[in-house]
Regions:
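Single, function-defining residue in the core of a domain
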Residues: 1-39, 69, 73-78, 87-90, ...
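Short amphipathic alpha-helical segments
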Residues: 28, 42-43, 59
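Major-groove recognition helix of helix-turn-helix-like DNA-binding domains
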Residues: 55-68
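A short glycine/small-residue-enriched secondary-structure motif
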Residues: 60-63, 112-116
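Short, compositionally biased leader-like segments
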Residues: 81-82
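Two-metal-ion RNase H-like nuclease active-site motif
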Residues: 89-100
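Short glycine-rich loop/turn motifs
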Residues: 105-111
Length: 259
């Protein structure tokens, strides 16, 4: 039964991934092993998918797969979009995850697809440094997505305060990508009447739970809509968007629930 499942999955994977059949077959076994074992421990996975092989032989085969086979991110992304039942438009999210592995800093910048409050990474960069991603790195991931799928299906790009920048906003406007990005409350904007003012000053009269929207403001050289809410614990939360500003706070709250 397991051999049959591996064969079936291998045929599906061969439609999306390049490489010889043996490697694709090993990938199929690893995927089924992950689902069966519920762990990323390679030794445990080997027990679930060893078929007629000895445990040690299967373990070495899986190790060799990860050592010798480099996955193409475009192929991974295409496969993810195939297996996720999303017939409508896509919500993208910028995220960054970092942790320490011994003395090494692991710091990944990710472009993910939102699905049922889960962010599924499709493109990523190992920053190999501490701190945030650069404009070049943000636009690099967006261009990868554009080249593979285009932006026509994108309904929104969500991101936290660290991601917004002059160059990113200009790129999103140029490519007509809908976005909802949180901004810092000390940003300076120019109102439609030409008045320069700090974001926190323009929304300082908000009561807890109250939402306010300002349209056609200029932020970092781009025309944006600002939507703000005052929270009891967190204080002022402001997002910049280029579409449906009345729903921007709700859209961003969805981003905060994504894992």
């Amino acid at each position: 039964m397991l051999n049959e499942k591996i064969t079936q999955l291998t045929e599906v994977l061969r439609s999306y991934f390049t490489g010889n059949r043996s490697r694709i077959e090993c990938m199929a076994a690893i995927i089924l092993g992950l689902l069966s074992a519920g762990t990323v421990n390679l030794s445990t996975i080997s027990d679930f998918v060893k078929c007629n092989l000895l445990h040690e032989s299967m373990y070495k085969r899986i190790q060799g797969f990860f050592t010798e086979f480099a996955l193409c991110l475009d192929e991974v992304a295409a496969f993810v979009l195939f297996i996720i039942p999303m017939s409508g438009r896509l919500r993208l999210v910028f995220d960054r995850t970092n942790w320490k592995f011994g003395k090494s800093d692991i710091n990944y910048f990710v472009l993910a697809i939102c699905y049922r409050k889960v962010a599924i990474p499709i493109y990523w960069i190992n920053l190999e440094k501490r701190g945030c991603s650069s404009d070049e790195e943000k636009i690099q991931l967006l261009k990868k997505f554009k080249n593979a799928f285009g932006f026509d299906r994108v309904s929104d790009l969500l991101g936290d305060r660290e991601f917004i920048s002059t160059r990113l906003l200009a790129y999103l406007e140029e490519e007509k990508v809908p976005y909802t990005l949180r901004i810092k409350s000390d940003h300076i904007i120019t109102t439609a009447k030409g008045k320069e003012i700090r974001v926190d000053k323009i929304f300082n009269a908000l009561s807890v739970g109250e939402i306010s929207v300002i349209e056609n403001a200029t932020l970092l050289g781009s025309n944006v809509n600002l939507s703000a809410i005052k929270l009891r614990k967190e204080g002022l939360k402001v997002v910049a968007s280029n579409h449906n500003p009345d729903q921007a706070i709700i859209r961003y709250e969805d981003r905060e629930q994504i894992e």
